[in-house]
From Swiss-Prot:
Family of the protein in this entry: Belongs to the NqrB/RnfD family.
Origin: domain of life: Bacteria
Membrane topology, record value: Multi-pass membrane protein
UniProt name for this protein: Na(+)-translocating NADH-quinone reductase subunit B
Leading EC class: translocase
Subcellular location: Cell inner membrane
Role played: NQR complex catalyzes the reduction of ubiquinone-1 to ubiquinol by two successive reactions, coupled with the transport of Na(+) ions from the cytoplasm to the periplasm. NqrA to NqrE are probably involved in the second step, the conversion of ubisemiquinone to ubiquinol.
GO cellular component terms listed in the entry, alphabetical order: plasma membrane
Length: 412
């Protein structure tokens, strides 16, 4: 019996009148993973295309894999030197025994020696990342299924993307219960309350992170959360620049200065998926060439960031080192690159019109640099910049449409 035949045989049990009718969203979600939906458009007008919502979301899901795998490797790369800086040999073994992440990693064969190989670093990073991702996926999926069953509609595949994006923009040390709480806020409050996928005006992953930032700032920001070594305090390069300028950039664990290439490749502490600009650009190219993301938004964000950073460079300041940060450093530090490629380009919460996309992107770039430079308490500005632009996206589209209407009336 083939898989397709099995799926077709089970379908009557889940359709109207079947014993499992109320669970049809679960059946439909599983069936359309393997095969395209059987329904076709019968009336005019419609578009024939090789991609549907599920496959579009899966493309984005795969596109973040380069940043995800590098992020896991980087967690180990930052953690092992930090552990050796904190502990001697005997103390390190005690620390491993007292931390379940380290214990699981050691059981999996991870070497905690100073010369540990890339596989040990990757495995250690996976031990921190995968529990966060699995927690977020299960909790987010639960809410998606619950709302689909109650509303009697198909399960929206957006949670595939929302879950992995959320897991990649948080620190590796985030408690699992906070990960569950954050994704619950993002899915329920920022998306499902407004009608689900396609109707939300805020990016759910960013909304969930913003909730954690304001509700539990100690676990989502500061100097203690970016390196997964118990008791280790190390600021991100963005925070270091904010306090001491470019000369202050140094890897706290190794004592080695941080170069621009280190930041571009991702050899710095930070949120799991935001550290490597190179890997983010590789994934971003996939969704840009796949036409899932809009190049106009990406270009607008870059233009807004470069113009605003250059303006602050020209103005200068004797008391605020952030005024002197060049645009190419803004690009590789913090969550700018990840936000530009995967958050700002969210087709639901971004502007729809071409001109609106330019305005939307420029606003994000301007606001990100403005928050980073002018706000001394919050050196990272990409999250708030995108959420702020989400609120203005409908206005940009409205103004573009009204301008088109006026132009057509003037012709006639």
């Amino acid at each position: 019996m083939g898989l397709k035949h099995l799926i077709e045989k089970l379908e009557p049990h889940f359709t109207h009148g079947g014993k499992l009718e109320k669970y049809y969203p679960l059946y439909e979600a599983a069936a359309t993973i393997f095969y395209t939906p059987g329904q076709v458009t019968r009336g005019a007008a419609h578009v024939r295309d090789a991609i549907d919502l599920k496959r579009m979301m899966i493309l984005v899901w795969f596109a973040v894999f380069p940043a995800m795998f590098w992020g896991m490797y980087n967690v180990g790369l930052q953690t092992i030197p930090a552990l050796h800086k904190l502990y001697g040999a005997e103390q390190l073994q005690q620390a491993i025994a007292n931390n379940w992440h380290y214990s699981v990693a050691q059981w999996l064969g991870v070497s905690f020696s100073a010369d540990a190989g890339w596989l040990s670093m990757m495995t250690l990073g996976a031990v921190f990342f995968l529990p966060i991702y699995i927690t977020v996926f299960i909790v987010g999926g639960f809410w998606e299924v619950l709302f689909a069953i109650v509303r009697k509609h198909e399960i929206n595949e957006g949670f595939f993307v929302t879950s992995i994006l959320f897991a990649l923009i948080v620190p590796p040390t985030l408690p699992l219960w906070q990960a569950a709480l954050g994704i619950s806020f993002g899915v329920v409050i920022a998306k499902e309350i407004f009608g689900g996928t396609g109707r939300n005006f805020l990016n759910p992953a960013l909304a969930g992170r913003a909730f954690l930032f304001f509700a539990y700032p100690a676990q989502i920001s500061g100097d203690l959360v970016w390196t997964a070594a118990d008791g280790f305090s190390g600021a991100t390069p963005l925070s270091q620049w904010a306090s001491g300028g470019g000369e202050a950039l140094v890897n706290v664990a190794t004592g080695v200065p941080v170069s621009w290439m280190d930041a571009f490749l991702g050899n710095i502490p930070g949120s799991i998926g935001e550290v490597s600009t190179l890997m983010i650009f590789i994934g971003g190219a996939i969704i840009l060439f796949g036409r899932v993301a809009s190049w106009r938004i990406v270009a607008g964000v870059m233009i807004g960031m470069i113009a605003t950073a250059t303006l602050f460079n020209v103005i200068g300041s004797d008391t605020n080192p952030m005024f002197a940060m060049p645009w190419y450093w803004h690009l590789v530090l913090g969550g700018f690159a990840f936000g530009m490629m995967f958050m700002a380009t969210d087709p639901v919460s971004a502007s729809f019109t071409d001109k609106g996309k330019w305005s939307y992107g420029v606003l994000i770039g301007v606001m990100c640099v403005l928050i980073r430079v002018v706000n001394p308490a919050y050196p990272e500005g990409m999250m708030l910049a995108i959420l702020f632009a989400n609120l203005f996206a409908p206005l940009f589209d409205y103004l573009v449409v009204q301008a088109n209407i006026k132009r057509r009336k003037s012709r006639g």
